[in-house]
Amino acid sequence: MPHRGPVLIADVPDLEAVLRGCFLQDDVVYVTRYHDALAALTHRKYRLIVIGLHFDHSTMFELLRVIREHDEYKKTPVVCIRALPSRLTDEARHGIRHAMLLMGAQAFLDFPPGPAVAERICTELRRVTDEGVGGS
């Protein structure tokens, strides 16, 4: 698969290897702190942005808000994910998904822990981004 453009991933250090592995053909910028994400947004144009629920003490909502306020990123696909164990109820996860979509995310992908979770994460990220980005 040819290189399709830079991807910004904002999530916790524990998921870096897994999430980078989902985009082996892309130029990935991986950040673990909110201010690094803001700096990254000003230095390049990304074709896709992935934000984890647990990113920098749960600043996923704030980062998505800032991204959507940038004219340059109004149409950039943003996928939010939960890939670490949490104590959220089904209702809370549903509420987060609903809020993310209302705020302009393309999707909120929820991955409960279990066997082959890394493979499931990559499969779903590819599916959602291929549908929404169209390979551009």
Question: Could you describe each region identified by the protein language model?
Answer:
Residues 32-48, 52, 56-58:
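Acidic, metal-coordinating helix/loop segments flanking the phosphotransfer/catalytic sites
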Residues 51-74, 82-83, 88-95:
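Conserved phosphotransfer microenvironments
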Residues 12-34:
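Two-component/phosphorelay signaling modules centered on CheY-like receiver
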Residues 119-136:
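The C-terminal output helix
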